[in-house]
Amino acid sequence: MIVFVRALGVEHLGEQPFADSIPWLPTGDTVFEIGVLVDPTGAAVLFFVSITIFMIFLYSVGYHNFGQPAGDHDRAGLPPHGATVEEHGHKHVVPSVEPMYSRFFAFIGLFAFGMYTLVVSDNLLTLYVGWEIMGLCSYLLIGFWYGKPSARAAAIKAFLTTRLGDVFMLLGIA
């Protein structure tokens, strides 16, 4: 945070933004490129996106009970029910770890990658790729507990809603 605030006071900071691109899909006379562009505005957004992603990861570790034992009756696709442990001769139920803990964090990590791609994109093609990655991950995260009918219905609703927006976005790009 200190570095960010100090960087705001530096003169000529945004005169040389970082930009790079690579040819991705050559089609005849046209070459589609994928690239990145980090200017002062993009750097500020990256800063806040990074803080947000860190907070999401930190919250998720506690929410999914990392470090707790596996539950006796937990099943993949459903929220954890709790684990029975014996301490000092007494049995009691404690929160149990999410059965698909690593899968959840893979989805969150991919969502973060899509968000970073969206922020640093230097053209509409790269922006669209980042947007689609985020849309896919939104569907996967909303329907993470797929054993619950309400989670499945919400995931499908979110998927269809974002696909409608994607069609119009793609038409606007074309």
Predicted features by range, described:
Residues 1-174:
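...captures the hydrophobic TM-helix bundle architecture rather than a specific catalytic motif
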